[in-house]
Amino acid sequence: KSRGLGDVYKRQVHINQTNICVLACRFCAFRRSKKQSDAYALTIDQYITEMDKFAEHIDEVHSVGGLHPDWDVDFYVDLISAAKQKYPKISIKALTAVEVKHLSIQSNISFSETLLRLKHAGLDSLPGGGAEILNDEIREIICKGKESSEEYLEIHRQAHLAGIPSNCTMLFGTIEKIEDRLIHMDKLRKLADESSMLQCFVPYPFLPDSSRLPQAQLA
């Protein structure tokens, strides 16, 4: 790819809109409940203020966060629309598959409709986070309550059908085996074969820190 297209990179900033989450994945040290003292949820104005700090130096903003119990698709439509209105040239990569699922449940609409509404608001692409390991037995242990393996793939599939490109990921070093990693990558390879909308694969190691997963391999 480097030889054929040249080196490609983005100048981006990460803005995590909230750490409040209705789930409590065992590997996650980011999540907070609404009652915890260090819980936060940015207003739309606060989000735009964060963009203001970096706007001259970036061409993309990357935003993921917790599953806030009070936010539905309307909130994100308003947030993305406001960001695009002020910074139309900055690409917005936001919302992992489980966030899309959460918004669809909160708003009682399909994955497809959720994604189309977000696209019309100005969403440019989806990050790949949340894939973890695409094995539902493992997911039941490390991230109980998140989207299933098939739901992760289907949400990315629906995004591609809506014209929204996406990334994909793999979290390794929790409790999975090498075989699980290979199966995971094969599932993503098959998804990539369905369209040209899968932009990149990002594997990243588990970092224990303050997580609640003592049996992790730390690979």
Predicted segment positions?
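Single conserved hydrophobic/aromatic residue that forms the stacking wall/gate
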Residues: K1-L5, Y9
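Glycine-rich, proline-tolerant flexible connector loops at the mouths of alpha/beta enzymes
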Residues: R11-H14, K35, V64-V73, D136
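Canonical Radical SAM [4Fe-4S] cluster-binding loop centered on the CxxxCxxC motif
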Residues: R11-Q46
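Conserved alpha-helical substructure of the radical SAM core
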Residues: R32-G65, D78, Q85
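Generic structural signal for well-ordered alpha-helices
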Residues: M51, Y76-S81, S112-L116, L153-H156, ...
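Conserved glycine-rich "GG(E/T)P / GGGxP" loop and the immediately following alpha-helix
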Residues: V61-K86, L103-S107, E176-D180
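Alpha-helix-loop-beta-strand connector modules within alpha/beta enzyme cores
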Residues: W71-L95, A121, S148-P165, A219
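Conserved C-terminal portion of the radical SAM core fold
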Residues: Y87, H120-A131, E150-R212
